[in-house]
A protein has these predicted regions:
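Membrane-embedded transmembrane alpha-helical bundles that form the catalytic cores
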Residues: 1-212
Length: 212
């Protein structure tokens, strides 16, 4: 049934954590026997209070690398740089290659025009918008790092959306925050589906099996 598949999906997220964290703990232990001391790579990620904090607890070595070599060089929370726009072009090009169509470029162009219009109307929002773009770029490139496929682009994109939505959510009233929390839960379930799926269309089928 759909409920059983949903429970299995939550169980899979625990399995991934147990496997990944366990293997890294074994590597850390073996390294200590040889006189090397490696930093901790997981810090109870499922206790994280928000998506941003989750990525400070999960696969810490990768998260730190993405922060130091992608997010901060792009400008981080200080604004956009030339690297920000290079990343957008690169991600768009990868999307075009994967889809074999220019519709991705068209969608990105429309979004860019909308963002430019919003910045023109409200220049005081420029810094926040650029910071969120840097976050999205970082998570999308982090997804592509796992594999150049739609699965991982969606996985990275949903992670980025979760981080951006939380910034909006944390300052809102309790009813709106509850609604956004439900959306984040749905996004989390989608993340758990698309990560292990061997192909994008199979991930879509899995969603149908659970929710339809």
């Amino acid at each position: 049934s759909g409920f059983e598949n949903l429970v299995a999906l939550f169980g899979y997220s625990l399995q991934v954590y147990a496997d990944f964290s366990g293997y890294t703990d074994m590597a850390i232990g073996v390294a200590m026997l040889m006189g090397f001391y490696l930093p901790k790579n997981f810090n109870s990620p499922y206790k994280a209070p928000n998506p941003g904090n989750f990525w400070k607890r999960w696969h810490i070595s990768l998260s730190k690398w993405l922060q130091d070599y992608l997010y901060i060089p792009m400008g981080g929370n200080r604004g956009a740089t030339f690297g920000t726009y290079c990343c957008i072009v690169t991600i768009t090009a990868i999307g075009v290659i994967l889809s074999g169509s220019l519709w991705i470029a068209a969608v990105v162009s429309v979004i860019a025009l909308i963002i430019t219009f919003v910045i023109w109307l409200k220049p005081e929002k420029r810094l926040k918008i650029h910071t969120n773009i840097n976050s999205m770029n970082t998570m999308l490139l982090g997804g592509i790092w796992h594999g150049a496929s739609w699965n991982f682009m969606i996985w990275g994109g949903l992670n980025g959306i979760g981080m951006v939505v939380f910034k909006f959510w944390k300052n809102r009233n309790v009813y709106l925050r509850t609604g956004i929390l439900l959306l984040l839960l749905i996004a989390f379930l989608a993340l758990a589906i698309f990560y292990p799926a061997p192909a994008f269309n199979i991930g879509v089928v899995w969603i149908g099996v659970i929710f339809i």
